[in-house]
From Swiss-Prot:
Its EC number is 3.4.23.36. GO terms for cellular component: plasma membrane. It is found in: Cell inner membrane. This is Lipoprotein signal peptidase. Keywords: Aspartyl protease, Cell inner membrane, Cell membrane, Hydrolase, Membrane, Protease, Transmembrane, Transmembrane helix. The active site is at 124, 142. It is an enzyme of class 3 (hydrolase). The keyword Transmembrane helix applies.
Length: 167
């Protein structure tokens, strides 16, 4: 006797592929259209296009470590993406609250891995600022990773399956 199979959430990898494609398309535009390290205002006083490069991780962590960090970040991104893909294969398709953040993180992580393989660094181009305070430059892959991490955090806070039961 076989048990009924339920569709898993691997279909959400289509979102990951879309994020990778959009991320790489925007970075191709940046590399052919924006000058290096010169702000191009989008919204004065808040947002610039600003082509820059990051050999490190978030907030340029380990960016001056000498090159070995590229392989560390590639291994981490591929390992985490592999784990999240495995989790998607075990997640029922209807559980979009789990599948969506996993797909976002996978797409963003692989988008930045492609940069590291192609260029030896990640291409950043979105710069937000207020007055003299500048947030570190980032890209669409970074945005997907952050949105996915926030989604996982919110899910863990508000998921009714894991909340204490009241008598």
């Amino acid at each position: 006797m076989t048990r009924p199979t339920h569709p898993n959430a691997l279909i959400w990898l289509l979102l990951s592929i879309a994020i990778i494609a959009l991320d790489q398309a925007t970075k191709a535009w940046v590399l052919t259209s924006l000058p290096e390290y010169i702000p191009v205002p989008v919204i004065h006083g808040f947002w610039n296009w600003y082509r820059s490069y990051n050999t490190g991780a978030a907030f340029s962590f380990l960016s001056d470590a000498g090159g070995w960090q590229m392989w560390l970040f590639i291994a981490l991104a591929l390992g985490i993406s592999g784990l999240l893909t495995f989790w998607l294969s075990r997640t029922p398709r209807r559980e979009w609250r789990s599948a969506l953040p996993y797909a976002l993180i996978i797409g963003g992580g692989i988008g930045n891995v492609i940069d590291r393989f192609l260029h030896g660094h990640v291409v950043d181009f979105i710069q937000w600022y207020v007055g003299s305070y500048y947030w570190p430059s980032f890209n669409l892959a970074d945005s997907a990773i952050v949105a996915g991490a926030i989604g996982i955090g919110l899910l863990s806070l508000f998921d009714s399956k894991h909340s204490p039961k009241t008598p």
